[in-house]
């Protein structure tokens, strides 16, 4: 995923 809440970048965190 690509979300600001997950940090600056795209990774499977959502």
Curated annotation (Swiss-Prot):
Keywords attached to this Swiss-Prot or TrEMBL record, sorted alphabetically, are: Amidation, Disulfide bond, Hydroxylation, Secreted, Toxin
Its localization reads: Secreted
- Please tell me whether the keyword Cell inner membrane is annotated for this protein: no
- A GO CC term attached to the entry: extracellular region
Q: Give the GO molecular function terms.
A: toxin activity
Q: In which tissues is it expressed?
A: Expressed by the venom duct.
In this UniProt entry, the residues modified to Cysteine amide are 14
Q: List the disulfide bonds.
A: 1-14, 2-10, 6-13
4-hydroxyproline: modified positions: 12
Major subcellular site: secreted
Superkingdom: Eukaryota
The domain section of the record reads:
The cysteine framework is III (CC-C-C-CC).
Q: So what family is this one in? A: Belongs to the conotoxin M superfamily.
Q: What is this protein called?
A: Conotoxin Ar1446
Organism, scientific name: Conus araneosus (Cobweb cone)
